Amino acid sequence: CIRDRLNHGKESVCLNIKDAEDFLILKNIISKSDIFIQNLMPGATNRLGISSKSLREKYPSLITCDISGYGQNGPYSKMKAYDLLIQAESGLANINGSSQEPGRVGVSVCDIAAGMTAFQAILQALIGRNKTGLGRGIEVSLFHSLADWMNVPYLQTVYGKRKVKRAGLHHATIAPYGVYKCKQDELILISIQNEREWSSLCSLVLKKADLIKNDNFSSNSNRVMNRNMLDQIINDMFGSMLRKDI
């Protein structure tokens, strides 16, 4: 059911590539294709005689895209890859969740990241082919796609010399930012990105204009440093208000 909904409007065919007749159908489809995408285990297409390299030699205008867990080569290339494993190994799980334990992102973000990376690379290859007439070989892995998304935590750790702490819905470098409890146990999420928004929150919502110039909260850096104190003030105010009134 999920597969049908996600692939709505697409034409599909199911082939047994170990069957000679079905394999012939596959090769016939490839001969007429602009793009060949596969996510079999590294080396599988070589054994079948339809490696990306051999296909591009036979069809120079063909764009090929090999998707794997950890890349086509290297010590991890033969290992099975699952979304949860990649979330952990890339460090994503370590910056999600609560201060008590790591957390999994609630969607298959590694699969999605690899798909998006493949998509944009294929579009670039199509533009290039319009100019040169030649296809291109593309390799995408779940791990490298997600590792690229982890660039900011990496830079904060390596060059900022500080470990990124898990903060739930809070932001490591912005405050106030996160979910707060209102009257009747309703929840509201706010994200204050600049001093103008901070001033508006204090004067228009919290009705506490004196907080704007308070030394503890006079800059974003100070607000982050005194996050617990600030969150307590906001929760105390919001706790007496209905979400619709905020």
Predicted regions and their residues:
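Short, small-residue-biased leader/transition segments that mark boundaries at the very start
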Residues: 1-2
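Rossmann-like NAD(P)-binding element
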Residues: 6-46
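Electropositive phosphate-/nucleotide-binding environments in soluble metabolic enzymes
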Residues: 20-23, 27, 103-106, 116, ...
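Generic non-transmembrane alpha-helix signal with a bias for helix starts/N-cap capping motifs
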Residues: 23, 38, 48, 122, ...
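Active-site-adjacent "lid/gating" segments in soluble enzymes
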Residues: 32, 46-192, 200
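Aromatic-enriched alpha-helical interface/lid elements that frame and gate functional surfaces
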Residues: 176-246
